[in-house]
Amino acid sequence: MVVTSVISTDLALALVRVVVGLVIAAHGAQKVLGVWGGPGLAGWTQGVTRMGMRAPVFWAWVSSFSELAGGIAFAFGFLLPVVAAALTIQMGVAIERAHWGKGFWNSKGGIEFPFTLGAVAAINGIADPGAYSLDRALGLPAMGVGVYLVVLVVGTVAYVLSSRASAERAKVNRAA
């Protein structure tokens, strides 16, 4: 009974990771490659610029490749706590920059979709990657919730500091 439960839990985690990871990777491919109606990297860089981000070229690369490579790594359960933290941050930034103030529902541009993806990333970041993961197949040591939290905090602080500098620069530009 216990063995069946563990196998079922590991399989369920893996299936959720594959589905959500591929959805996130597809969004990254839109941003990087311009496929499936996406803007491509040049168009995404313009979008990041319109969002008022400081160093828009840098953040366009970070965000798009976080989604593309991170989504694939997430699907396979590779370096899971690190990747899950990066994806959690990415979805938080998407909410803050593009969806906040538009309500909850995705149909009106709200936070529903990135919130759900971020929640799944966060849950997997604090969970053991399970038997059906590249981490386990490669014999990588369990990194645990501590690694997830450290990456989450460091990445969030980097984003907040960048945002603060961007907001301060915008104030100076408006005053000039």
Task: Please provide the spans of the model-predicted regions.
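Membrane-interface interhelical connector segments
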Residues: 34-62
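A general structural signal for well-ordered alpha-helical packing
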Residues: 45, 69-72, 86-89
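Residue-level signal for alpha-helical context at structural boundaries
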Residues: 46-47, 66, 110
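Hydrophobic, membrane-inserted alpha-helices
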Residues: 65-74, 98-99
